[in-house]
């Protein structure tokens, strides 16, 4: 599962803390100025964002499909992964790579979970159109989910096993390009140079494992990622080395 960038969203507990009136999605001008001036409470920011995503769903999906089609035709990493998936008797193309709006999910302990995409062995890849910023973001997300698809075809991954899931998350974060230095620097404000790639991969793998409903807490997520780290981070198949 491809996570969105690492800024922590408000939790559901913010809803209880806010003594503001009920959010009114029809008060567009007032809401816009509240966002602009920084006076909108966190709980209303969540509702405002989800309302905007719903309003612009068609526009977002159309743009996402345009970026998807471009990458399927021109992206070296996407074309490479498509070929290697075909070599394992799999198929990923515009028919089973779909752009959809992905609402924020609230976990049992009240955390807000957003995602950039997902892979299902039965259905293919879903790109979260409301989370995609540009064609490069779609490329990274496609590459991430295609690594999951390749892993599933190659090793018959048991996605209910956290160790299996953690290994694939490590590989997907490492090989997709989402942890390259420029993306860390410009979109996540992480300015470290030494060990930057490893730290990014570990952080994002832990976050993805933690987002799975059957992961108990961050302690378990870190433990599982650490258990499989050495073998999974060093495994760059189907690439000869980390591509970018």
Curated annotation (Swiss-Prot):
EC number of the protein: 3.4.24.-
Region (Disordered): 1-22
Topology versus the membrane: Peripheral membrane protein
Annotated binding of a divalent metal cation, by residue: 144, 148
Pfam families referenced in this protein's UniProt entry, alphabetically: Peptidase_M76
Compartment annotation: Mitochondrion inner membrane
Active site: 145
Major localization listed first in the record, in broad terms: mitochondrion
Keywords assigned: Hydrolase, Membrane, Metal-binding, Metalloprotease, Mitochondrion, Mitochondrion inner membrane, Protease
Any one of the GO BP annotations: mitochondrial protein processing
Purpose: Has a dual role in the assembly of mitochondrial ATPase. Acts as a protease that removes N-terminal residues of mitochondrial ATPase CF(0) subunit 6 at the intermembrane space side. Also involved in the correct assembly of the membrane-embedded ATPase CF(0) particle, probably mediating association of subunit 6 with the subunit 9 ring.
Similarity-based family: Belongs to the peptidase M76 family.
Protein name: Mitochondrial inner membrane protease atp23
């Amino acid at each position: 599962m491809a996570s969105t960038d690492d800024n922590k969203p408000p939790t559901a507990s913010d809803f209880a803390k806010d003594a503001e009136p009920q959010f009114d999605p029809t008060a567009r001008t007032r809401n816009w100025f509240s966002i602009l001036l920084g006076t909108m409470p966190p709980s209303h920011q969540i509702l405002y964002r989800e309302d905007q995503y719903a309003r612009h769903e068609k526009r977002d999906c159309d743009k996402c499909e345009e970026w998807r089609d471009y990458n399927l035709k021109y992206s070296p990493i996407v074309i490479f992964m498509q070929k290697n998936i075909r070599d394992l008797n799999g198929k990923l193309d515009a028919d089973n790579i779909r752009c959809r709006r992905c609402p924020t999910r609230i976990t049992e302990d009240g955390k807000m979970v957003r995602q950039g995409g997902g892979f299902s062995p039965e259905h293919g890849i879903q790109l979260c159109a409301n989370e995609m910023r540009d064609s490069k973001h779609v490329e990274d997300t496609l590459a991430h989910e295609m690594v999951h698809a390749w892993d599933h075809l190659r090793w018959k991954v048991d996605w209910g096993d956290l160790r299996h899931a953690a290994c694939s998350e490590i590989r997907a974060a490492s090989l997709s390009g989402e942890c390259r230095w420029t993306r860390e620097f410009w979109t996540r404000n992480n300015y470290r140079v030494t060990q930057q790639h490893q730290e990014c991969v570990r952080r994002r793998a832990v976050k993805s494992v933690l987002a799975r409903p059957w992961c108990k807490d961050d302690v378990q997520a870190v433990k599982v990622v650490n258990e499989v780290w050495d073998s999974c981070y060093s495994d760059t198949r189907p690439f000869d080395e980390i591509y970018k």
